[in-house]
From Swiss-Prot:
Job of this protein: Plays an essential role in cytoplasmic secondary envelopment during viral egress. Interacts with the capsid via the large tegument protein/LTP and participates in its transport to the host trans-Golgi network (TGN) where secondary envelopment occurs. Modulates tegumentation and capsid accumulation at the viral assembly complex.
Cysteine pairs bridged by disulfides in the record: none
Family affiliation: Belongs to the herpesviridae inner tegument protein family.
Protein's name according to its UniProt entry: Inner tegument protein
Organism name: Equine herpesvirus 1 (strain Ab4p)
Signal peptide (UniProt feature, chain positions): none
């Protein structure tokens, strides 16, 4: 509500002005003052604002005193309901943030409860013949809320002690639901809907839910039936998620490192790539992290230092087929291997077997997910299979990237296949659903917060994944149905019904005990209207009355104690802030209801429609809306639900007057337009029942064309949405331009590098790189393997940049869809407001929407040129070069170290011949090389070879090894061994070893152990 103070303070001020706060005899109230009293109480009952604990503690004693005086002065149901149930009604409005210093916040609440149940308040109730045993009275609320607070304190104490360190070696871990269940026990049903309870449920979920995947990862690491590599990968996931460096304690880091070292030592050597092949293929950042940790036997080592040669964990297809290296039930624990398999399309037998095994593994996981009915079951199905939160993200990105590449390739040429294979489909299904499950798990609980998160997440699935879901073989709403079985909210809706029934019971009691004018209790109308609106707005439910009577509607005037002239005369006195009110007897007459709606509600309707969408104007309109809602609450029923509609409008508009007001959206605007349309129907129906001679003009149906308020609201919503779209597109444009610039720069660098003259240096396995002109000095001399490695690095850099660009383009296409929808809505609004002063503003926004859509499409087209085809433009021959080099390198390794050298040497010769023939064919069609300046070529060479050492230019082709060891000074060490071919000294048999080595005496293991034992025995 647009008030200087909140509703609680406003009620205190209003009652204090009417009744005074001195302990004197209660003054008698005139009818006008009685109406003000009832109106003030109804306004408090209908208010939707909140109050802080401190303010409630300050105001409660005063309000309790004034409520008792109000009952003594009026003996109305309104005052009785307020005085007897004030504790619960105030607690319902308490806003308590448990996030910071939970224990202090609990103590604050206990202080408030003691104030509510204080002796003076209880005495005042008893002294005025009011009950202290009301369901929402001080006694019952003190009992229920204090018990809940004690329970909450205990839960938070356990949560504070439940840390990764304390639970790592725990024999039993509590189910996440066991923490929240005590807080939603049936004895707390009356306070379940209260905001401080809902906030408590939210904070418990936030602090506890991590335990579920944590416990499953610990279980996977400790499972002795799993392969050592699988267990090590589980432990790495555990470290990354719950014991990261910087937050983990030193003790836990040492213990985890010791566990990890012991585990890694049991991994079979066949799980590693040989040293000679570690740089044969590029690695992802996560693969580097995994390999570095396992090779160094330390989970906190995340990379290998530059220049260091280290083993790496295999990620080829064959490792996925080995049951001895990877447990079949948790293949996805080795996410990098699965990702590499899914991102390729190799047709060989090993890859086919691996894809079949991965597909079977993921299919079993998918079936378990679909059969799961609780969060525990679905998370267990994911984590035990290796689909941790991190791994789901990795595999989802791989499938999305591969699908996007397929689509772009299919669009670039006819006859292309743009479908995913079965392994990619089923892994994609598990990864996407798993990612959503882990996101939902962060807030899963029995409260309102999880309902909001769940509905928001589900509603964004289709727009985010779009065509991918159908490509994965999922039916429409398939993901939603799968998640619904296990992750759907399970709120205690019967508690909401119980709370309403309790309010209804209290209203019946006070209505029987007191006598008020008319046939309708203002307290009943206002309180139940407030509760029903709250239930529908927050929980999305409509709770029927226990008597199941149909909604009251306006009926034709058939009989009345008063003539039409009397009713018309009384209605003419109805206006906002009017000093002269109609007689109470006429207001109580049911025949007066249409007149009241046709005047009071019509005034409020016109006030909001004609107000500008600004703080001052809307604030004034809200005052009129509140007056219309509260007027005649004790006399006129909530016919056609007009009070509920007014309450909904007030609640929808009020947030825009706050300091941290939300940005209005199209959903806000459409919702308010619909509410005003419903209110218009009520007003039109009321006007139709008034005699024609006194009938006021029927207002136009509210629309953006006829309402200044709606036009301003829609205009603001459209502008803010456009502003957001422009900002996001600008940010995305910068990313795309930066990525595209990097791709083009790398392509240009490689193009210039290969336009240099490259000459072999015989005997050194090196090449000289010259500028294009024959007379120029060379840029330098490098080993051939370093040149190939440098070219491969730049090529892989381009591939990574293209993957980033592809992801940005997918996001851009989503923005294009959003912009197109925004354009259509803006165009429709411009048409509706044509000819009005707002029409020009909407047309201006329409122009900006069109410009944005054009810019987005142009950006997508230009970025797509770098994504068409399997290679970046200009890199086809570079890829061919690297593939040929790789093929020759593999055959050379086999020929020099294989068990059947003759066969491998023949294969090497055939490979060389095939490559040579291809090169000769390509030379015939090679266009003339472009001319570049020496400076441009030099910069290209510097970028590629700047990090590699040059080969020295001297007469000798090789250097001999020296017997230098135990180095004290590097000055006498022959460093040429690092740059040249090595020649063995003549006195060393390089095949059978040095004969003198066989005649030497060596220290045996048994002798060494005996010496150690002797040392320890002598010290005893």
């Amino acid at each position: 509500m647009a008030r200087e103070h909140g509703s609680m303070r406003a009620l205190v001020n209003s009652l204090a002005g009417l009744l005074g706060e001195t302990d004197t005899e209660v003054p008698s109230l005139e009818p006008a003052m009685l109406m003000v009293l009832k109106s003030s109480i109804s306004e408090f009952f209908l208010s939707t604002d909140t109050v802080s604990v401190d303010e409630a503690a300050e105001l409660f004693p005063r309000l309790q005193f004034l409520a008792c005086r109000a009952y003594a002065a009026s003996h109305t149901p309104d005052a009785a309901m307020l005085a007897e149930n004030l504790a619960g009604l105030v607690l319902w409005r308490i806003h308590q943030n448990w996030t910071d210093r939970e224990m202090e916040a609990v103590d604050q609440m206990f202080v408030l409860l003691e104030i509510m149940n204080g002796e003076s308040g209880v005495y005042m109730l008893s002294n005025n013949n009011l009950r202290i045993s009301a369901k929402y009275g001080p006694s019952n609320m003190h009992l229920i809320v204090s018990t809940w607070l004690d329970t909450f304190r205990n839960v938070m104490s356990v949560a504070a002690k439940s840390t990764p360190d304390s639970l790592f070696n725990s024999k039993r871990m509590e189910s996440i639901e066991e923490f929240s269940k005590p807080l939603v026990h049936a004895k707390f049903n009356l306070i379940y809907d209260m905001p401080f309870v809902q906030e408590g449920l939210r904070i418990v979920a936030k602090k506890i839910n991590w335990i579920l995947p944590f416990g499953l990862m610990v279980k996977g690491y400790k499972d002795m039936s799993m392969a050592p590599l699988t267990r090590a990968l589980f432990l790495l996931s555990l470290v990354d998620s719950y014991f990261p460096k910087g937050t983990a304690t030193e003790g836990s880091m040492k213990a985890l490192t010791a566990y990890f070292r012991e585990l890694v030592r049991t991994i079979d050597n066949s799980a590693f790539v040989p040293i000679t092949e570690v740089n044969a293929t590029p690695r992802t950042a996560y693969e580097v992290r995994v390999s570095s940790a396992i090779v160094h036997q330390n989970p906190y080592v995340t990379d290998t230092k530059a220049g260091m040669v280290a083993e790496r964990v295999r990620t080829d297809a064959e490792i996925l087929t080995s049951g001895a290296l990877l447990s079949s039930g948790a293949l996805s624990a080795h996410a990098t291997a699965v990702a590499k398999l899914l991102s390729s399309n190799e047709p060989d037998d090993v890859s086919s077997r691996a894809r079949a095994r991965v597909a079977e593994h993921a299919s079993n996981t998918w079936e378990t997910i679909q059969a799961s009915t609780t969060p525990t079951q679905v998370v267990e199905a994911l984590v035990t299979a290796g689909f941790t939160s991190t791994h789901c993200g990795i595999l989802e990105r791989v499938v999305v990237d591969y699908f996007t590449r397929l689509r772009s390739t299919a669009n670039s040429g006819p006859g292309r296949n743009d479908s995913l294979d079965y392994a990619q489909q089923v892994v994609g299904c598990v990864a996407i659903v798993g990612g959503v499950v882990f996101r939902l798990l962060l807030s899963y609980g029995f409260g309102l917060d999880y309902i909001r998160d769940y509905t928001t997440t589900i509603s964004t699935l289709e727009p985010v994944y779009n065509e991918l879901l159908s490509a994965l073989g999922l039916a429409d709403k398939g993901v939603e149905q799968t998640l619904k079985r296990s992750m759907a909210p399970r709120p205690y809706m019967n508690y909401i019904s119980a709370a309403r029934a309790a309010l209804d019971d209290e209203l019946l009691i006070v209505e029987k005990r007191t006598t008020g004018p008319g046939t309708h209790s203002a307290a009943r109308e206002s309180l139940l209207t407030w509760f029903d609106f709250r239930a529908r707005d927050r929980w999305g439910v409509r709770i029927p009355d226990r008597d199941t009577t149909s909604t009251q509607v306006l009926a034709p005037i058939t009989a009345s104690l008063y003539s039409d002239d009397d009713l018309i005369a009384a209605a003419s006195k109805l206006s906002f802030d009017a000093l002269d009110a109609p007689p109470t007897q006429i207001i109580d007459d049911p025949s007066f209801a249409p007149y009241m709606l046709a005047t009071v509600v019509l005034d409020a309707f016109n006030a909001i429609l004609t107000s500008r969408f600004s703080a001052d104007s809307v604030s004034q309109a809200l005052r009129v809306l509140s007056w219309a809602r509260d007027y005649g609450a004790g006399s006129i029923a909530n016919v056609d639900g007009y009070r509920t509609k007014l309450t909904a409008i007030i609640a929808s508009v009020s947030p825009f007057l706050q300091k941290d007001a939300p940005t209005p959206t199209m959903a806000h605007a459409n919702n308010l337009e619909a509410l005003l349309g419903e209110l218009h129907s009520v007003v039109v129906a009321a006007i139709a029942l008034i005699p024609e001679r006194a009938r006021m003009p029927v207002p136009e149906r509210p629309s953006v064309k006829t309402s200044t308020f709606l036009a301003g609201l829609f205009l603001t919503a459209v502008y803010k949405r456009l502003e957001t779209l422009v900002g996001h597109t600008a940010e995305l444009t910068n990313n795309i331009l930066g990525t595209a610039s990097g791709i083009v720069s790398s392509i240009v660098t490689l193009n210039r590098f290969f336009n240099c003259r490259i000459m072999p240096v015989m005997g050194h396995y090196a090449v000289l790189i010259y500028p294009q002109s024959a007379q120029s000095a060379p840029f330098g001399r490098w080993r051939l393997v370093d040149v190939v490695d440098a070219v491969g690095s730049i090529y892989n850099e381009v591939s990574d940049l293209r993957a980033d660009l592809r992801a940005d383009v997918v996001t851009l296409k989503g923005d294009i869809t959003s912009a197109a929808e925004a354009l259509q809505e803006c165009e429709a609004l411009a048409v509706k407001t044509e000819g009005t002063r707002f029409g020009k503003l909407f047309n201006s926004l329409l122009t900006r929407h069109t410009q944005l859509a054009r810019a987005q499409r142009g950006l997508a087209i230009r970025a797509g040129k770098l994504l068409g085809g399997s290679e970046a433009p200009g890199l086809k021959h570079v890829n061919t070069f690297l593939q040929r080099w790789g093929a020759i390198s593999v055959m050379y390794q086999k020929a020099t170290s294989g068990s059947t050298p003759e066969v491998n040497i023949t294969s090497l010769a055939n490979t060389l011949r095939h490559v040579w023939d291809e090169v000769q064919q390509e030379r015939k069609a090679t266009p003339p090389s472009r001319k570049f300046s020496n400076r441009d070529l030099g910069l290209a060479v510097e970028r590629l070879m700047g990090g590699y050492p040059e080969v020295l230019d001297d007469d000798s082709n090789s250097t001999a090894l020296t017997p230098k060891f135990n180095v004290d000074s590097w000055n006498s060490v022959n460093m040429d061994a690092l740059r040249k071919r090595v020649t063995m000294p003549a006195n060393i048999d390089s095949i059978r070893g040095n004969d003198s080595l066989a005649t030497r005496e060596y220290l045996k293991k048994e002798d060494l152990l005996a010496e150690i034992d002797a040392i320890f025995n002598n010290t005893k």
